[in-house]
């Protein structure tokens, strides 16, 4: 996709493993991909949300892909006993979603406090960038 992205090489190394073991997206992640990658000004992007959506649809057709519904709430105190700052909410939400569905949350972000989510430490997977 974006060969100039800081983590492009790491993503290329990681994706074959994800394909073998299975990988997942949810509406939140899909929307973010189309919104960001589809911006006309995004360098090396497809130029429009429609084209980004077509590219996303191609990857979603892979047999290794699993769709996870956005079926948890930040108001569920059992899943979210404590919240970090506002910049961490989306990552914690995605981590809790992975816990609920018995999968893992793969990320390049080493700053996520995965211990805030019950089961989060086991579900957190940091993708190596070096």
Q: Can you describe what each PLM-predicted range is?
A:
Residues 1-25, 37, 41-51, 120, ...:
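Short, well-structured N-terminal submotif of metal-dependent ribonuclease cores
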Residues 3, 27-31, 53-83:
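Acidic catalytic patch
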Residues 11, 90-91:
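Amphipathic coiled-coil/heptad-repeat helices and related helical stalk/stem segments
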Residues 19-22, 64, 102:
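Residue-level detector of structured alpha->beta connecting loops
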Residues 72-84, 92-130:
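Acidic, PIN/NYN-like endoribonuclease modules and their adjacent C-terminal/linker elements
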């Amino acid at each position: 996709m974006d060969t100039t992205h800081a983590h492009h090489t790491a993503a290329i190394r990681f994706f074959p493993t994800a394909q073998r073991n299975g990988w997942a997206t949810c509406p939140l992640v899909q929307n973010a991909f189309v919104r960001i990658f589809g911006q006309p000004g995004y360098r090396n992007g497809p130029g429009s949300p429609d084209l980004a959506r077509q590219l996303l649809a191609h990857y979603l057709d892979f047999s290794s892909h699993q769709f996870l519904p956005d079926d948890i709430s930040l108001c569920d105190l059992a899943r979210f006993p404590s919240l970090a700052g506002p910049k961490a909410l989306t990552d914690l939400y995605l981590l809790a979603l992975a816990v609920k569905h018995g999968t893992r949350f793969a990320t390049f972000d080493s700053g996520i406090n995965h211990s805030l989510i019950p089961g989060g430490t086991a579900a957190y997977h940091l993708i190596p960038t070096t």
